[in-house]
């Protein structure tokens, strides 16, 4: 230290404004020995060298403490250390098990899972890769069979064996090499990465040396110690800091904009007694998941299954009701009960102004819709009834023709919209309710477009050019919709994104970008269909919706365009429709 004058040390900060540029906040888990929480300096020095601000996290297995800590982090490093207690994996201890650290196990497994829920970028180092695996449903071998020496006697800065890297991996993108030299200090290793991770590197004796997210999340685990490998090791820390910076940018963006999902079917699970204020594993949308994914609002629909000829409606639903209208009312009653029980955090919104008010006041919003005009029971007065209940749209039909129009999966009963359906659309226009043609047949779509005096919408519909199923929209339909000022929102139902293989977030982005190419940025958005079989790898539930934003930022969409995609276009149409009310 050159001087012991405090003022001179502060001068660098005091001589400019702001006093410091933003740097991503990177949490590092501490070791625990005796009564000391400790961390070797190489970890935090590499974070600083990579451009991050390190914060050491003590091993405290208290969910309140952990959640509050994670709220301030942009990235997380799970550091090295002793063995995990195998009981966390449901296993008895091997005779070769070394010292375990009970102070760390519960705390770090909780941190890893909760950070995963929040989509926080993570790096696991040595013990840390094993923490990731255990926390996310994988397995760790308690004592590996070594054909290569994995616990070196050489100095920690000295690489002693080779790691072979898969080319389609984050690690390859970091090093641009299929083989790198690493140090090694372990006798345990990941044996099964589980569903959320995939193996991306192995040693020559087939020990797993690195894993990454299998869901396009920013998660990387390495079995070696890059903090000791100077410039070569720094590259991994730079990767994490870069991802943390992107995550920070996405979080800040979500604070400024409104994020609206235009279609979810969570009420389908009401008969199971779901708890919206719990992180309920039975549903994809709840207060926890919306908060983790930085989602402001969703549109919950009363979905009414279309009976086949000879079937009764009551035989197709779990609640004892007289008919479709009473069923829809019951669903809305139950949504109102949920909101009433959680009124500090949740509200029903009926207009764009309500949504923005809820966001300013720190509440999540639910908008109401009807999926299948069967709810009207061939009674035009029920349009007014449901308008008074606060619905914002009616999807005219579902899977099967009804008395309003023909379905994409129908029998061409009316050759499009029926005469009753025409009256329904006109009444919806009069009462300020959006006309939704998701599930509608192609002739029904064009009829509705001609009949409606306000723009129509497709709350959850993807592109037939990319996935040729009748339920998706053709390019001509998209162009016609855009010409009338309407919007079509990409959905996350796997069968509407691809016909073969597993759909993932990249398929959803491809459908969105195709819609943008065809219709323009002013006519697109996202309608997940969560809890109605929507949900794909990378966008599996509401907690993962910030990953959608990260993909948009990665593709250099402007904030203005992201606002439009995240509901701005939809709310423009809603405003037009509601202003037409007369």
How would you label these PLM feature ranges?
Residues 24-25, 53, 121, 139, ...:
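Proline-centered loop/turn at the N-terminus of a beta-strand
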Residues 249-413, 468-489, 493-526, 530-582:
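N-terminal hydrophobic targeting/anchoring segments and the immediately downstream early-domain regions
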């Amino acid at each position: 230290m050159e001087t012991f004058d405090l003022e001179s040390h502060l001068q660098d900060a005091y001589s400019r404004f702001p006093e410091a540029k933003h740097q991503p906040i990177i949490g590092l888990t501490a070791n625990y020995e005796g009564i000391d929480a400790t961390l070797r300096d190489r970890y935090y020095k590499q974070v600083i060298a990579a451009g991050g601000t390190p914060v050491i996290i003590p091993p405290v297995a208290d969910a309140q403490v952990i959640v509050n800590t994670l709220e301030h982090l942009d990235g997380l490093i799970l550091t090295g250390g002793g063995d995990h207690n195998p009981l966390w994996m449901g296993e008895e201890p091997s005779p070769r098990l070394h010292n375990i650290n009970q102070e760390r196990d519960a705390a770090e497994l909780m941190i890893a899972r909760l950070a995963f829920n929040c989509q926080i970028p993570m790096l696991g180092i040595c013990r840390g890769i094993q923490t990731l695996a255990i926390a996310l449903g994988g397995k760790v071998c308690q004592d590996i069979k070594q054909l290569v020496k994995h616990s070196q006697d050489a100095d920690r800065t000295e690489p002693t064996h080779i790691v072979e890297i898969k080319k389609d991996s984050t690690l390859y993108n970091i090093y641009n090499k299929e083989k790198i030299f690493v140090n090694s200090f372990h006798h345990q290793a990941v044996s099964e990465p589980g569903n959320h991770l995939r193996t991306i590197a192995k040693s020559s004796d087939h020990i797993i040396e690195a894993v990454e997210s299998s869901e396009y999340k920013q998660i990387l685990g390495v079995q070696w110690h890059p903090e000791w490998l100077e410039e070569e090791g720094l590259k991994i820390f730079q990767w994490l800091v870069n991802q943390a910076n992107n995550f920070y940018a996405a979080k800040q963006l979500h604070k400024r904009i409104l994020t609206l999902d235009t279609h979810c079917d969570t009420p389908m699970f009401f008969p199971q007694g779901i708890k919206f204020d719990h992180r309920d594993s039975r549903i994809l949308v709840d207060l926890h998941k919306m908060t983790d994914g930085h989602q402001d609002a969703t549109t919950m629909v009363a979905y009414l299954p279309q009976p086949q000829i000879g079937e009764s409606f009551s035989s197709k639903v779990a609640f004892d009701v007289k008919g479709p209208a009473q069923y829809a009312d019951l669903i809305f009653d139950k949504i109102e009960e949920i909101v009433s029980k959680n009124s500090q955090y949740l509200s029903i919104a009926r207009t764009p102004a309500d949504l923005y008010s809820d966001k300013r006041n720190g509440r999540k919003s639910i908008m109401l819709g009807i999926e299948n005009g069967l709810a009207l029971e061939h009674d035009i007065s029920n349009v007014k009834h449901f308008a008074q209940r606060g619905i914002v749209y009616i999807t005219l039909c579902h899977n099967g023709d009804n008395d309003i129009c023909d379905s994409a999966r129908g029998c061409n009963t009316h050759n499009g919209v029926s005469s009753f359906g025409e009256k329904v659309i006109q009444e919806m226009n009069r009462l300020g309710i959006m006309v939704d043609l998701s599930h509608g047949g192609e002739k029904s779509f064009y009829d509705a477009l001609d009949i409606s005096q306000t723009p129509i919408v497709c709350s959850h519909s993807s592109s037939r050019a990319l996935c040729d199923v009748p339920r998706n929209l053709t390019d001509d339909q998209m162009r016609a919709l855009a010409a009338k000022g309407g919007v079509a929102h990409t959905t996350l139902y796997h069968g509407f994104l691809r016909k073969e293989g597993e759909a993932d977030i990249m398929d959803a982005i491809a459908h969105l970008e195709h819609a943008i190419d065809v219709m323009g940025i002013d006519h697109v958005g996202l309608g997940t269909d969560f809890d109605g079989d929507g949900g794909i790898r990378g966008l599996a539930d509401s907690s993962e919706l910030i990953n959608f934003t990260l993909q948009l930022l990665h593709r250099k969409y402007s904030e203005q365009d992201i606002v439009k995609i995240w509901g701005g276009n939809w709310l423009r149409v809603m405003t037009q429709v509601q202003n037409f009310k007369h």
